[in-house]
């Protein structure tokens, strides 16, 4: 864009305080969704289907405590006009078809003596036809494709009842990769909780991840028939997802009085396997943040309404029961972890951050958090340490999912009331069983689901999506409920949209090209003239010692709300930032004239961080964003000094070089610093 073009719409700012949404539990000032529900070696989870066969995932919304309170009633909103349906897989009430989604037709033109394949699908998170699924809704669209480079259970319906010893053949570039004997329908994996069979006519085999790649086609032959017409699946991204866990121990919580780090720093192995089974990724890598944990005695909650709905100024908290509403501390911690993720250069990448919050009340007792928060599409969420329904729901928000019932009402979710009525069935490779769209008999919600769930013609309950009251709809032995095919497709789209750190790329980065079904080299660019950072805030130095510094500041002067958090140090990344003592750096961020002319134009550049190291050396960094009126960086916002407005409060996070110990951290007042650095700037805060 040219410097003189119309300003872009203001992006919701996790550092500041956008207006709350109408359904917040208490009016909030953060663009996040809520849900009332020691350093270690990175864990890598590749696809486990083959092993299982052989051995046996910015607006505010609120949820209720156990996730069931938000389930719609059986007589929910009238259905929206669905996407054009083309039967090709199981329905919600009758196994064997796919309503609500458009599927690609199977190849035809079978000749005499040639085996015919009526249906071919691949079970990974869901049973998906080889051509994928797609939806066009009044206010949204989505698709779900087979996941590239992930094992799959292939399901084949053969046209001839007398086919003998059918075999699945894989081909690429005219070469045969191999063949797999198909197991008969009688050997099809069972359904969870001993439920109804998925189908009675599907032959099956486990296809290795190496064959589940673009360019591979599959055909079926038999000893008494020649090979069928080949089908080439349309694949989705082969990207992995890295899940980074950073536990926050708050208000004196430690291993002696609270769940220890050994249990909070990562989900256990079985839970990691179940997360992988639910998320449409080729690989799941779980790691504890290299800092281990973040221990805080004080947390600053930004301006927000209390439990009665009355607006409150920003305030410090030193015990969980001091917060004035149920989401105050969670909101503050979500802002911190979101900004820390950006400061570490992880913002555009294929990763998710989750922060278990371990907190004490004023009596020194461990406090039950009772919920979580997730920034919609932000890649970050906070919640409890149990890694159950709260976790999977909040990370759903981090993937870009809103509450499914709300989205259905807005024409952006295809199934009534946020249910799975119309979704294809799911599949779990760890248990090696199908996941019905109906609530199983062993689910905790089963006995009373009729009063809160959508019902089929026989009065049976459809599952709710985890983004709308689904917790409790899973079979005994599972931690997580089943996502709909539609929401899984949206998670796949989020993953496909991410930048991948890719050593095989000439630029070091790649992105998935959906049309080409391949990764393409990606060159980072600076969008919007630097309005939201340089080169998408990707690292300029990676794997180096860093100190992360977080500062909260109340321009209204709210008591205790201006605070420099204790820094923490680890091996991380540095993104492009600017030194206001450097004339070249000041020129680069000069409003409307510099190399990055919009870097300071949004809400100003009026504050500088000065870090003095133990050896006496110093580093200075401009803190982007402040309290100016949008697109008028020389004039204060009308609410900049209103203590009840989010516009008076900001949280910055920045990484600085960590090769030396810090002696002092100071926040300096440097108005319109692109015009020049004051010789003796006022020190606003010091630590």
Curated annotation (Swiss-Prot):
Cofactors (names): Zn(2+)
Active site: 394
One of the GO BP terms on file: proteolysis
Cross-referenced Pfam families: Peptidase_M66
Region: Disordered, residue numbers: 1-45, 73-112
Residues binding Zn(2+), per UniProt: 393, 397, 403
Enzyme class (EC, first level): hydrolase
Source organism, top-level taxon: Bacteria
EC number: 3.4.24.-
UniProt keywords, alphabetically: Hydrolase, Metal-binding, Metalloprotease, Protease, Zinc
PROSITE patterns given in the database record: PEPTIDASE_M66
GO molecular function annotations of the record: metal ion binding; metalloendopeptidase activity
Domain called Peptidase M66: residue spans: 233-501
Cofactor annotation remark: Binds 1 zinc ion per subunit.
Family per similarity comment: Belongs to the dictomallein family.
Protein name: Dictomallein
Species of the source: Burkholderia pseudomallei (strain K96243)
């Amino acid at each position: 864009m040219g410097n003189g073009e119309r300003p872009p719409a203001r992006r919701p700012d996790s550092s500041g305080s956008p207006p709350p949404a109408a359904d917040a539990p208490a009016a909030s000032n953060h663009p996040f969704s809520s849900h009332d529900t020691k350093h270690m070696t990175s864990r890598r989870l590749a696809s486990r289907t083959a092993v299982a066969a052989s051995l046996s995932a910015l607006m505010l919304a609120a949820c209720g405590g156990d996730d069931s309170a938000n389930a719609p009633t059986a007589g929910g909103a009238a259905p929206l006009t669905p996407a054009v349906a083309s039967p090709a897989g199981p329905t919600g009430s009758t196994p064997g078809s796919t309503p609500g989604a458009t599927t690609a037709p199977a190849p035809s033109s079978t000749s005499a003596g040639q085996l015919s394949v009526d249906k071919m699908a691949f079970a990974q998170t869901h049973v998906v036809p080889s051509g994928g699924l797609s939806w066009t809704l009044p206010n949204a669209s989505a698709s779900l494709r087979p996941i590239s480079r992930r094992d799959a259970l292939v399901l084949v319906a053969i046209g001839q009842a007398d086919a003998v010893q059918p075999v699945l053949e894989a081909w690429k570039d005219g070469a045969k990769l191999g063949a797999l004997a198909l197991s008969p329908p009688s050997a099809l994996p069972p359904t969870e909780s001993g439920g109804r069979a998925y189908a009675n006519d599907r032959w099956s085999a486990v296809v290795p991840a190496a064959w589940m790649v673009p360019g591979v086609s599959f055909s079926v032959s038999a000893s008494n028939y020649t090979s069928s017409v080949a089908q080439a699946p349309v694949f989705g991204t082969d990207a992995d997802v890295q899940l980074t866990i950073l536990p926050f121990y708050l208000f004196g919580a430690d291993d002696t009085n609270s769940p220890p780090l050994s249990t909070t720093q990562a989900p256990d192995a079985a839970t990691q396997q179940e997360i992988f089974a639910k998320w449409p990724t080729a690989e799941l890598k779980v790691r504890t943040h290299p800092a281990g944990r973040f221990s805080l005695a004080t947390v600053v909650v930004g301006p927000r309404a209390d439990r009665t709905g009355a607006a409150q100024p920003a305030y410090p908290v030193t015990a969980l029961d001091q917060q004035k509403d149920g989401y105050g501390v969670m909101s503050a911690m979500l802002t911190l972890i979101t900004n820390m993720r950006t400061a570490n250069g992880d913002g555009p990448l294929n990763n998710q951050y989750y922060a278990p919050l371990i907190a004490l009340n004023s009596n020194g007792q461990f406090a039950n958090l009772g919920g979580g928060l997730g920034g919609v599409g932000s890649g970050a969420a906070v919640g409890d340490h149990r890694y159950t329904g709260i976790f999977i729901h909040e990370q759903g928000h981090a993937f870009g999912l809103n509450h499914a019932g709300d989205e259905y009402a807005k024409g952006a979710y295809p199934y009534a009331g946020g249910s799975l009525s119309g979704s294809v069935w799911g599949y779990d490779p760890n248990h090696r069983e199908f996941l019905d769209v109906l609530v199983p008999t062993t689910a905790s919600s089963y006995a009373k689901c009729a009063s809160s769930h959508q019902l089929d013609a026989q009065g049976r309950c459809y599952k709710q999506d985890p983004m709308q009251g689904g917790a409790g709809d899973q079979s005994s032995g599972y931690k997580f409920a089943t996502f709909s095919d539609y929401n899984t497709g949206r998670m796949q789209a989020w993953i496909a949209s991410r930048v991948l750190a890719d050593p095989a790329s000439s630029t070091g980065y790649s992105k998935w090209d959906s049309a080409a079904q391949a990764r393409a080299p990606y060159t980072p660019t600076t969008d919007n003239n630097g309005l939201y950072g340089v080169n998408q805030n990707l690292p300029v130095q990676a794997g180096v010692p860093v100190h992360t510094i977080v500062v909260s500041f109340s321009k209204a002067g709210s008591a205790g709300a201006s605070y420099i958090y204790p820094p923490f140090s680890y091996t991380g990344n540095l993104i492009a930032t600017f030194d206001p003592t450097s004339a070249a750096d000041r020129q680069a961020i000069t409003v409307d004239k510099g190399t990055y002319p919009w870097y300071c134009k949004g809400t100003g550049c009026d504050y500088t961080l000065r870090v003095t190291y133990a050896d006496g050396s110093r580093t200075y960094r401009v803190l982007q964003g402040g309290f100016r009126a949008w697109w008028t960086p020389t004039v204060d916002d009308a609410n900049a000094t209103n203590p009840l407005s989010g516009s008076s409060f900001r949280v910055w996070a920045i990484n600085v070089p960590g090769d030396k110990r810090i002696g002092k951290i100071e926040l300096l007042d440097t108005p319109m610093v692109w015009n020049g650095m004051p010789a003796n700037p006022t020190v606003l805060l010091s630590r």
